[in-house]
């Protein structure tokens, strides 16, 4: 019984740490305190914004008219997360766990900084090569009816009026993620006249790896 209760407690803590992570981390205000059985929650960071290898893209502001005709702003910011090999144990915990690191690609929709839906492309193709792309979307509560946000604040749909305007930001992030996944480094040779058995390859992080040169005449 206690083991089962412990599982539910951990699941609840993880859920709240993600949903309210921007409040818990004190974004734009004093940090919110949430306790679960005397355990103080720490906010997660699904974008790993402070990681040196996170590719943080420019924030885009999209003006949208609400149901009363008043202009409101929807902000969109793409992120391309680091490779798993570049993550510390703390990074893995902050991102929500390594099991979700690849699976939860896509949009992260916030209503007044509260996460309401995440890890979806809203019908766009989910690709192995874009597994590190995540798009932060901030919407004000004045656009609830346009976004189709339900009373539980758990579901939202992208309105047709801004779907096309989001495409550019999404495609940019996905292109970056694909390039990061398909980059294989640059082969460096000390002497072009030498038929090396091993290729010395410089990767993005200035580290070197060695691979068999299968174009060598020896093979």
Residues of each region from the PLM?
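Charged regulatory segments coupled to nucleotide-binding catalytic modules in large multidomain enzymes
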Residues: 4, 8-10, 43-45, 50-219
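GHKL-type ATPase core
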Residues: 1-36
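Flexible loop/N-cap segments at domain edges
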Residues: 39
